[in-house]
From Swiss-Prot:
Coiled coil: none annotated. Keywords: Cell membrane, Disulfide bond, G-protein coupled receptor, Glycoprotein, Mast cell degranulation, Membrane, Receptor, Transducer, Transmembrane, Transmembrane helix. InterPro entries: GPCR_Rhodpsn (IPR000276), GPCR_Rhodpsn_7TM (IPR017452), Pglndn_D_rcpt (IPR000376), Prostanoid_rcpt (IPR008365). GO terms for molecular function: prostaglandin D receptor activity. This is Prostaglandin D2 receptor. Disulfide bonds join 105-183. It is found in: Cell membrane. The chain crosses the membrane at residues 22-42, 59-79, 108-128, 151-171, 196-216, 263-283, 311-331. It comes from Bos taurus (Bovine).
Amino acid sequence: MRPLFYRCHNTTSVEKGNSATMGGVLFSTGLVGNLLALGLLARSGLGSCPPRSPRPPPSVFYVLVFGLTITDLLGKCLVSPFVLSAYAQNRSLRELVPGSDSSLCQAFAFIMSFFGLASTLQLLAMALECWLSLGHPFFHRRHLTPRRGAMVAPVVGAFCLAFCALPLVGFGKFVQYCPGTWCFFQMVHEERSLSVLSYSVLYASLMLLLVLAIVLCNLSAMRNLYAMHLRLRGLLRPGSRERAEPGAGEREATPLHLEELDHLLLLALMTVLFTMCSLPLIYRAYYGAFKAVPEQNGTTEETEDLRALRFLSVISIVDPWIFIIFRTSVFRMFFRKIFIRPLIYRNWHSNSCQTNMESSL
């Protein structure tokens, strides 16, 4: 029986009027972005060094970034080829592999939900690491090691594997979305099935909690950075040796917290875009579970659900490009010249003027 709200659930061909162009562009953009991000990590973030120089150990932050990049790359490589193949053969996911019935659709939906949740959890781990490094440096230095950071990806993978497999054992349901090239868990049910709707609400609630936790961690890290800035101003107060020249404050600040500022800016932008891409899915899951949807609006509701899924899939494409931009030396130099140096010089100049006025009196 075809679900009333999912008209493409049992279709065997791709719905007319749809093109693979956008899917191909998104796949190639995500693939190139993740590969470039991995190249940057291998070149600098994970400890590349000149000949005859000791190789520095990778930082916990870069280990986590590496895990997130690998996760996004795997998700993109496991999902997009099936979408492009479905368009090329004009077959839906249910019929793309003859004799598989709905097995491929089930696997596709599992992979989509798995990597969507795994990327979110790893982004939370990065936000926690940044917060601890700024707010609790002693605890961070003593307990957070690169080896422990490398354990985040396997632990996250094990949890997501168990959680996202629940629809395969009857708690929740995977369905095929129009135009026949997407499969995901069902968010609207004509009979208000408790198991189907409970899983979608549980998934959305977990995503919402993760989003809130990431935002709180970043806000706390920003507060710690502001406190560091106030301490820096204290070093540049009148009578302090560091006030003699602007470069001294800058040299003092650069190794102390400018790298952490880079990390925080990277996390903040990734979090904003991640939140924008995740909230539509969270909203659609709650909307389908708690609001009675008229049967005649089934097509409209499915279109909105599909739009939310596409927003979710953009995360793995955007994240590596943000990382590439922020780790580019030209961008970092531009940012520090525009934002950091004027701030330090302003503090030095105001303190210097105050000292001159006091001496003239």
